[in-house]
């Protein structure tokens, strides 16, 4: 695949508005999660069309991702910041037509099912015990999804994308000191290793990121990357992301 998603997830604002310790950080994190879900779901849809994922795994993973999607929108601030699908995808240069359609259909189906269940409950009020027994199998088991290999891979993809976004965003905001960069880059490499191990693939750009991690680890606690190093690290991270995406 030649195209890949633009990682400039969040437009540059003032340093005060983008401070990781402000109240808006949770909104930024939720937007990153939404971005990750769209990317993961788009890849899942493509894998399903190639018979790389079974129907049962596909359905359960879609259900999990849609539940996570709706959970993010429980915060009204996230809803306002997200806007519409068109606004969000245009702003962050996303091309996820399959994912958008699946989410829209999934939410619509859930609402229809909820209304149907409610109507059935009313019609069987004369036999409440039967109604309760009928609805019991519809309860979602929260421990079921993690045991699903496809769900685990989708979660790993979403986590890797989010780590790329967080690391790149931090560097662009000049979080370039050792104590700021080291944990971000470490977590990114770990999440990359988890995914590549699951998919049995190798990422050549990983070596460059490891070299950066070693270099940052050898810095003094007060040291920061200079402008040239900052640009080089950003470039290597973007190259690594592009390679990861092309392998999915």
Curated annotation (Swiss-Prot):
It is a peripheral membrane protein. Belongs to the VPS28 family. The keyword Protein transport applies. Keywords: Endosome, Membrane, Protein transport, Transport. Component of the ESCRT-I complex (endosomal sorting complex required for transport I). It comes from the Eukaryota. It comes from Schizosaccharomyces pombe (strain 972 / ATCC 24843). Residues 152-248 form the VPS28 C-terminal domain. GO terms for molecular function: protein-containing complex binding. This is Vacuolar protein sorting-associated protein 28 homolog. Residues 3-113 form the VPS28 N-terminal domain. GO terms for cellular component: ESCRT I complex; late endosome membrane. It is found in: Endosome; Late endosome membrane. Residues 128-148 are annotated as: Disordered. PANTHER family: VACUOLAR PROTEIN SORTING 28, ISOFORM 2 VPS28, VACUOLAR PROTEIN SORTING-ASSOCIATED PROTEIN 28 HOMOLOG. The keyword Lyase does not apply. One of its GO terms (biological process) is late endosome to vacuole transport. SUPFAM superfamilies: Endosomal sorting complex assembly domain, VPS28 C-terminal domain-like. Component of the ESCRT-I complex, a regulator of vesicular trafficking process. It holds the Pfam family VPS28.
